Amino acid sequence: MEGVTKYGSGGRLRHSGLEETNYIYKNLVTGYPYSFENAIAGKTGTTQNQSDGWFMGMVPNLVTGVWVGGEDRSIHFEDIAFGQGATMALPIWGKYMKDAYLNPDLGISSEAFPIPELVSIPLDCENLNIESSKKKKDLEDLGF
């Protein structure tokens, strides 16, 4: 999760000072700097013809999503620079979260994500061709 919160969409949401360093990035990719200081994770998504974009964002006690698009598939952006989740949906989510954090009664977490006590997945690289029923059982044993 640290990779997403530090370097992925979360890093982009928290980054401030863009106005001094990269005007194009600030105005075209993020819309404006959000300057969140807390841990945030998220994932953007885009349809192949740039008619839909979405962003799913999360903090430790809240997951929310924003979808931008239309039912008529012929309506779409001609260019991926504007027709993607990062430029269509992410700015809406950022504004929503900024406003949500202004209301302490909502109790939205600004803490770090809890670290799991133990995450362990055994790998047997020498026996990659094991039968699929064994693979399925292994995944079920892990809770998947």
Spans of features found by a protein language model:
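A penicillin-recognizing enzyme superfamily signal
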Residues: M1-L128, L142
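Secreted/processed peptides and extracellular or luminal domains of membrane proteins
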Residues: I130-S133
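Extended acidic low-complexity intrinsically disordered regions
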Residues: K135-F144
